[in-house]
């Protein structure tokens, strides 16, 4: 199933282990969803066009983060589109803005 999701929807996490770890840590924040649903939501945020309710911040190295104002979802992504993390921050948009303003190393 994971392989099918990966092929059908583009990159996921860098490894199955990373997906498992992030789902275990953050999956409950999204209610009663499966690991596949968690992955799909992270991919949908990554693939949504920025603008309107979808905020985006890009770093010089190509990494980027997104925040969905409608649902409070935050995602951070590598340059190649693989998912770094996906969760619902306690401080919502403030968290996104704070991350976006952090200096690039």
Language-model regions: role of each:
Residues 1-7:
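Short, glycine/alanine-rich hydrophobic alpha-helices that insert into or span membranes
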Residues 7-62:
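Compact soluble domain cores
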Residues 11, 28, 62-65, 72, ...:
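Short non-domain terminal segments
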Residues 13, 22-23, 38, 67, ...:
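Aromatic side chains
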Residues 44-48, 63-67, 91, 101-102:
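Short alpha-helical interface elements
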Residues 56-79:
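Basic/aromatic recognition patch in beta-strand/loop cores that engages polyanionic ligands
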Residues 75-105:
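A short, surface-exposed interaction/processing loop segment used at functional sites
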